[in-house]
Design a protein with these regions (language model features):
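Extracellular domains of the immunoglobulin superfamily
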Residues: 1-108
Length: 108
């Protein structure tokens, strides 16, 4: 059976008001529904910061250091969701998802 290359898709721009909730979606390509995805937060001028890993059953392992309980994840089918509740100013960042598939890593 031939496998298609792993492709991750992430919405490129999302805005939210302070105190609101937002959900980011990272979508895996067909055939990769069992893969785990790592979420990262990257503030301007800083390196990526690990948020947490998510599989089909939800969080895998622990949240990254200092990640508040307002951040949560969920996995369903090909989608891996990162939800941030009660948005705060310090949450303003670029968010990336990445998957390690054995022969390398893909990030968006």
């Amino acid at each position: 059976m031939a496998w298609a290359p792993l492709l991750l898709t992430l919405l490129s721009l999302l805005t939210a008001s302070l105190g609101a909730s937002v959900t980011l979606t990272c979508t895996l390509s067909s055939g990769y529904s069992n893969y785990k995805v790592d979420w990262y937060q990257q503030r301007p001028g800083k390196g990526p910061r690990f948020v947490m890993r998510v599989g089909t059953g939800g969080i895998v392992g622990s949240k990254g250091d200092g990640i508040p309980d307002r951040f949560s994840v969920l996995g369903s089918g090909l989608n891996r969701y990162l939800t941030i509740k009660n948005i705060q100013e310090e949450d303003e960042s670029d968010y990336h998802c990445g998957a390690d598939h054995g022969s390398g890593s893909n990030f968006v």
